[in-house]
Amino acid sequence: MKIIGHRIGGNIVSDKSSRFGDVFNPATGEVESKIALASIPDVDKAVNAAKKALPVWSETPPIQRARILFKYKQLIEENIDELADLVGREHGKTLADAKGSVVRGLEVVEFACGIPHLLKGEFTEQVGTGVDSFSIRQPVGIAAGITPFNFPAMVPLWMYPIAIACGNTFILKPSERDPSCPIRLTELLEEAGAPAGVLNVVNGDKEAVNAILDHPDISAVSFVGSTPVAKHVYSRGSLSGKRVQALGGAKNHMVIMPDADLDQAVDALMGAAYGSAGERCMAISVAVAVGDVGDKLIEKIAPKVSSLKVGPWDDPEAEMGPIVTKESLDRITTLIGEGEKAGAELVVDGRNLKLQGYENGNFIGGTLFAVSYTHLTLPTNREV
């Protein structure tokens, strides 16, 4: 079976790992590969590689770093189908959704290509008698990024292109559920001309995260994920003096007023609620219908939810793919059952969906509740 190792200093490394996890294909429910889970020595090795690359990279002229990023942008565009397939195969997103997420990340690479202008300092003459003032922008050193499962291409691309464009080196800890796309993105950056060690990938769980947060040679950490983990990253990382950015989760509602264009509202709601199987912080999980618009809304949206085309990532007709893990699927079906028990009307029940040839996949159909003010438990549950 394929072993997914860490990418450190331009090489795939797994021989020092004593712990391994499973990477599943959520459409089939089968183990696609084994992944090496980093411990402290693995993180130390990545830090040493980043430290070795830092002097040369930080002294590389910004315009030269930008040229490498322009080439990187080109390589991502040329390999976008492969990258989207890696995302879909391990996360479950439809190929169209996966490709769109790569494109959103690519926009940050394009922004990073303009870094020479953004790195200009400031100079002010005579701020006081005989006193001039100036500021310069310099790399902070080694930065790290800890990213979630739901956007294995887009969120890493939010982070490291800017960091490395500014002359820093970087250590990425992607989700252990879908690591292949981040590793491939690292290979493409090296192919574009970035020296080995500028971008390193360590796979792992909480042990790897804590090793990154505690390491004295890592100067900055960025995180995107759930709110409890964001609090942990912020508190533990800042203890050692790191610059920490921690973006927690979100809970989104759509409010539909009585004078709304319901056709437009339904189209927007279908994409926002069921895109990426709802596994994103931008997802709409609750729509608040004001006044008497609720019944009209249900009448219009229920047929669309019922006919939502669910399928594997590589089905070009699929509108929604599987849930990323069996555990997440079980949690969702449990919440649906709890909603029923609380008295909410289950208008469309997507449970127990089985697709021919994918009977072991983590699939659930579109599901729709109608909830009145007397049954508010479901829409106020943070887990929904």
Model features per residue range: what roles?
Residues T374-T380:
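Conserved small/polar residues in nucleotide/adenosyl-binding loops
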